[in-house]
Amino acid sequence: MLIKQLSSSYNEYNNNYAASFLIGPLPEGIAQSLGFNIRSVLLKEFPYFAVKNIRFNPENNNYKTHIGTKESIETIINTILGIDFNYSFDFYKAMGLYKSKPKALFQENLSKAKFLCSAKQVGEGILYAKDLMLPVGIKCTTPYKIIAHVTKQNFLGFTFELGFLFGLNNNIKFENKLYSIKTYPIQNINIEIINSKKSFNLNSESIILSFTTKSSLQPIDVIKILSYLLLNKHLILIKAFQQFLD
């Protein structure tokens, strides 16, 4: 990966640095997936980063971005260099999205999901991490059983926090009380867990959670909940609508 600094400036009035960068070229098949990663890593490391205009150029698989912060230009560069692109590559490849057309694949899944929802079938609503674009108009009245794959490092204290994007109330605890999920209503929708179990995969050093929600949710609400975790690297989904659609 190459980083080319296109411009930089310093504003004495507000003590703010700004720089624009060209990031790439990136590996084929994952370049379009990394805009969220770039933004989320920068904002996680430095919440006061102003990350603007992340634009992808499909002709040469690179990104152009403009960043403003009170941190030095060197800090910005080091932060961008610290983004784990290999992690993203392995993740999407493992999900079968490498060198595929994920948007078209996702739209195909939506058609199947819409049919199953209309048939009121209960299945496992397992979502693609990178395609957080489900139209609001597609509704589902079936309970969701969501299977999540969580790394040990990001599963601190057996607690998820779906944070500030959605408000601050309504703690949810699993029945076995070994761990809890803190989540918050979205558009006045509460999630109530009625079944749960936990297992540990020694090979991947990962914890597998499964739980069933009692509330009727729209797919867009589930995606909003999970996308916050995904973009903050608290949660990695290992399947995508697979059993829900089969």
UniProtKB/Swiss-Prot annotation:
Gene3D superfamilies xrefs: DNA-directed RNA polymerase, insert domain (2.170.120.12), RNA polymerase, RBP11-like subunit (3.30.1360.10)
Gene Ontology cellular component terms for the protein in this record: DNA-directed RNA polymerase complex; mitochondrion; plastid
Keyword Transcription carried by entry: yes
GO biological process: DNA-templated transcription
GO molecular function terms noted in the UniProt entry: DNA-directed RNA polymerase activity; protein dimerization activity
EC number: 2.7.7.6
Keywords: DNA-directed RNA polymerase, Nucleotidyltransferase, Plastid, Transcription, Transferase
Stored InterPro entries: RBP11-like, RNApol_insert_sf
SUPFAM superfamilies: Insert subdomain of RNA polymerase alpha subunit, RBP11-like subunits of RNA polymerase
Reaction catalysis annotation: RNA(n) + a ribonucleoside 5'-triphosphate = RNA(n+1) + diphosphate
Localization per Swiss-Prot or TrEMBL: Plastid
Key word Transcription present: yes
Homology family: Belongs to the RNA polymerase alpha chain family.
Biological role stated in the UniProt entry: DNA-dependent RNA polymerase catalyzes the transcription of DNA into RNA using the four ribonucleoside triphosphates as substrates.
Subunit composition and interactions: In plastids the minimal PEP RNA polymerase catalytic core is composed of four subunits: alpha, beta, beta', and beta''. When a (nuclear-encoded) sigma factor is associated with the core the holoenzyme is formed, which can initiate transcription (Potential).
Name assigned to this protein: DNA-directed RNA polymerase subunit alpha
Organism: Helicosporidium sp. subsp. Simulium jonesii
Upper lineage: Eukaryota, Viridiplantae, Chlorophyta, core chlorophytes, Trebouxiophyceae
